[in-house]
Amino acid sequence: MARNCLRINHEGDSIQLFWQRGQSNPRHAPSVTFTHPFDKQALADLRWYLEEYLRFPYGIAPDNAAKIEQKFQDWGEQLFELVFRSSEKAREFFQTATFDGLRECELVITSDSPEVLNLPWELLYSPSDRQFLAPSLAGMSRSLSDYAVRAEMSNLPQDKLNILLVIARPYGEKDIALKTIARPLLESVSHIRQKVNIKVLRPPSFEQFERELNAHPGFYHIVHFDGHGDFDPNSVGFQHTLGAAGQGVLVFEADDGSPQIIPAAQIAQNLADCRVPIFVLNACKSAQEGEEKFSSVATRLVSLGAKGVVAMAYSVYAEAAKHFMGRLYGELAAGATVDSAVAAGRREILNKRLRPSPNGDKPLQDWLVPVLYQQESYTPFIPASDTDVLDIDDFLEPTVSNLVGFPQEGRYGFIGRDYDILRLERAFRQNNIVLLQGMAGVGKTELACGLARWLEETQGRTGKIFFMSFEQGATLSNVVNQVGREVWGDKFSQYRAEQQQQAILKYLKTQSSLLIWDNFEPVAGFPAGNEPLLNGSERDNLQRFLKDLRGGKSWVLITSRREESWLDCGYRLLELRGLREQDVEELAAKILETVGVDRKNLPSEYLELLKLLGGHPFSLRVVLPHLKTQQPKQLIESLRQGLDTLDGTPDKVREKSLAVSLDYSFAKLSERARRHLPFLALFSEQVDAGWLHAFSSNPDDEDGQAYQAVFGENLQKADWLRLLNEAAAAGILEHLGETIYKIHPALPWYLRQRLSEQHAAQEVSELEKKLLVFYAVLADNYRKELISNAEMASFVLRVEEPNLLQNLRLAEQQQSWAEAQVILQALGEVHKRIGRKPEF
C-alpha cells in the first residue's frame, strides 16, 4: 500500500484537498470554488481522438490528432492548477506526498456528481515534474462522498481467480464485435490459465446471471460485464446530489437476443448476496454523447457494496484492452490490490501504445481510458505461496484439449466473424442442428473451427468437439468411430456396429458436445447433376442419425455451399456472407505484412479496394499481394472491368467475383505457372511437389508422356517448387512446410474451369486415368512399406489420404476395380494401425 494518499473531495460547488500519510489523521487544505475546466468542444475532441481517429487516419485527421495530443498537457495543467495550486497548503500537500516519488502516492477523487466523476482526471499533469500523474501513481480511483465502507467479504476461493464474463450483444450486427474484449482477455491470460478460471455466461440473460451466481455463492471474485450501459432518469430509488431521480442500468440479452434492461441496484444486490467483490465494466460505442451512463452504473454498484468497479471511460481498442486486461488480471492473480492492478494495467497501455489502423499501426495516448471506482483499497485474491522448485513434469504436461480431428489453423489465424459466432450461438439456443450455407471461399470452415475454439476456451461446450470433413465422402461409420474412439478408446471396437451407434447416440443426446460436418455438399452430389459421393443407403443413415439427435444436448453444425433439404431433419439455416469492414482490414493487414507491403505508404483508395472485394477472404488473399507492385487504383480498375461483365442473382455475382479475383491474380503469374498450375485441379486439399515431379518429369514413361501431351513439357522437382512458391506468394496456395502446399477448397473448382477451357475433355480424361494408376501404385508401394518402415509409410499415406480418396472415387466411377482395391487396402491397413478400421 502507498505511504501517501491525496484525496480530492468535491461537495456542492467547491473542492477540497486532503492528505494522509499512512494511518495518521488526514490533513486538509482550504476549500476552493469548483469551476468546470473543460468546454463541450474539448470533451468532444477528446472523444473523437480516442474513439474515431484511427478508423480513418487519412487527410487532415493525423494533424487534428496531433493537435489534440498537444492539448492533453494543457488540459492536464488546468486540472492541476485547479487542485494542487489553489492554495499554498494544497501546493505543500502535493510536494510532500510525492517527495518519495509518485509510486508512493495514491490519488482519490470523491464526489456524488456524475459530471465531476466523469472528468478525465487521468490527464492531471505536473508542470514541475513534466509528466502526467496517472501512469506513475501507485493508484488512482474515484469514490462516493456519503457512502460508508461495507463490511469485509467472507473468504473466497484462493486456488484460482474466478471470473464470470457476461457478453451481451442485443443490438445484433449494429453492435460492437462479440469478442472485442473476450478475445484479448483470453489471449492475455493464456500464460496464467492455471491460476485463472474464466466462464462465459450463456445465454447472457439476467435470469441466467442470477442462476449462475446463486448456484455458486462466494465463488466468483470478478464479474466482467462486456455490454451496454445507460442512465434511466425515471428509475426510482437513487438520488443525485442535484436532486434528479434515476439510476444506471445495464443491458443484458434475453434468450431470443432482444435487449433486457436491468437497473444497477438489482445487479448490485445479486453481487452482494452472492459475495462477488469486483465488477469490471466495458464501455460500448453507443455511449458517445458524454452522458453519465457508466459512471451512474459504477457509482450505484459501489454504493450498494461492490468493493471495486473497473470501467472504461471511452470505447477501448482491442489491442489496448489486451494489454490492460492481461496486466490487470495478471496482477490480481498474483495477489495485488485492485487499485495497484489498474495502475499496472494503465502503465502497460502507455508502454505499448501502437494500435492497428487501415494506414498501419499508429501510436495512441489511450492510457487514460480505464478508470476505477472503489470505497477502499481491496485485495480479492491471495494465492498460496509456493517456494518449491517446480518439477520438470509441470512443464512437460500436455495441454488437454476437447477438440478432435481439427485441421491445422491457416497462416493468418482466425479473424473476426464475431457477429456470425453470435448468430450461431443464438441459433443453437433454438435448434441443436444448424446448417451454415455460403459460397466457395467465403470462410465456412474457418468459422466452424473458430466457433469450436471459442466454445472450448469459454466453457461453451463441456463435452468433446468433433470435426469431420465430408469432402471425400465420409459416412456415418466414420462419424460413429471418431466419437467412439475418442470417448471410450480401443474398448469401443469390441462392440457390434449397432451397439456402437446406440452408445454414440445416447452419449451425444446427454452430453454437451458439438459435431462439425464440413464441406457437406458433395454427399448428395454438387454441383447439381453431379453423382453423389455417398449412395442412397449411406445418405439415409446420416439422415436418420440427425433425426435421432434432434432435441438432445449436443449441437450439430453442417457447412455446405447449398441447402441440404434432403436431410429432412428440421435444421436451422444460416447464410454466411463476407467479413465485416474491421475484420477485412485486420486480415488485409496480415496479408500485406506477409508480402512486405507497408500500409502507411498506401493511399486512401486502398480502403476502396477492400470494399470492392466484398469481404471475401479468398479474394483478399489472391488480390492484395499485387499491391507490392501496383497501386490500389490500378487494381480497382482491372477488377471493375471484370465485374462489369457479370450479371445474374447477387449470389451468382458474388461467386463469379471470386473468379474475377482469381483471374486477375492468375494473369499476373508467369506464363509457365499459368500453363501448369491447372494440373492441381486433379488434387484435393494438399499437394506434394515430390509426387508432382514423380508423375510429370520423365518423358520416357507413360505418365510423363501423358503430362507432356496436355501441358507441353515435363517438369522437374525444382521447376514445381518454383511454380508452387510463385502461387503461394500470390496467395493462391499456402506453403505448409517442406514440399507440401495447401489447396483452398475453392481452387480446384476454378482450376478445373481453366483446364476445361484450355484442353479437350478427352485429353483431361486420359490424364486423370494416368494419375489414378499413379496413386494406386503409390498406395500399394507404401502399403508394403508398412511392414518394414511403418512410421514413414503411415505418414505418407495419411498425408496423401485426400488425394487417395479422390482417386478412389474416380476408380469407382470408371469401374477400375483393381486400382480401387489397392487404394482401399492401403487406407484400410493404415486406418487399422491407428484405430480407424471401422470406418472402412
Question: Language-model segments: what does each one mean?
Answer:
Residues 412-529, 577:
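Post-nucleotide-binding-loop coupling segment downstream of the phosphate-binding loop, primarily
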Residues 137-146, 222-327:
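Catalytic cores of nucleophile-dependent amide-cleaving enzymes
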Residues 309, 417, 446-450, 474-484, ...:
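Alpha-helical sensor/transducer elements of the RecA-like P-loop NTPase core
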Residues 1-135, 157:
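Non-catalytic, solvent-exposed interaction/assembly segments
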Residues 448-453, 502, 513, 554, ...:
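C-terminal boundary/linker of central alpha/beta nucleotide-binding cores
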Residues 134-148, 247, 256-274, 333-409:
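Caspase-like cysteine protease fold
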Residues 761-840:
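Extended alpha-helical scaffolding segments used for macromolecular assembly and cargo binding
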Residues 150-253, 281:
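A domain-level signal for caspase-like cysteine endopeptidase catalytic cores
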